[in-house]
Amino acid sequence: MGKLSKEISALVTESRGLDIAKKESIEWYKKTASSSGDSSVENYNGPFKPGKIYIFRYENPKTKDTLEWWDRNPVVLSLGQHDGKDLGINLNLIPYARKIQLLDKIYDQYESRIDTMVKRGRGDASSEQGIPSFTYERVKPFLEKTGFGAAVRTYIIGLRKNSRVVSYSKWNRVALIDLNDIKGATINKAYSKIGKYIKKHKK
């Protein structure tokens, strides 16, 4: 169990259960997103920085007429830019246990850099830098090997609404948030498709 998993476990224990911890995390996000006194979640309109987590509305994808379903409220771990579009892993599409495994592994790998940025920025989401090496090209082998690549999506910057960036210091809260808004399907259908792919490719 890595550092992030331990922090999440502590939150669950403190809340006396996973369901309550998830509910409290959603309440935390909504309160923080609308607060001017807490900079751990801030408005953000620029291109995504690799390694940072963003939450936004995505109501009308350019290719929506050809999509079976899509998430209108993605929670995205950015992989940087690709062909002028934002690219990242939509954490909403990954079943909870697998999501924790993914975030824990990434946090452990970049822990030194993340901790330095949190201390330097004092938990201010906008001032924290990204992780330059956390790009699709660099992590593609890992994503393909584990199956997490099935949750990678691209987003047109101009179609994003109400975009917010979350501080690394709050990844423990983000891991507990369920903010999906699936159009054209249910979250269980999304979990089924993504979950099977991850299980199939897990080694």
Stretches found by the model and what they are:
Residues 48-50, 63-66:
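Short aromatic-glycine-(Arg/Gly/Cys) micro-motifs in beta-strand/loop hairpins
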Residues 2-54:
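Mixed-charge, Lys/Arg-rich low-complexity intrinsically disordered regions
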Residues 29, 70-71, 172:
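Short linear interaction motif-like sites in intrinsically disordered regions of transcription factors
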Residues 94-203:
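Intrinsically disordered, low-complexity, charged/polar segments
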Residues 84-93:
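Short, solvent-exposed secondary-structure boundary/capping segments
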Residues 64-83:
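Short beta-strand-centered aromatic/proline hotspots
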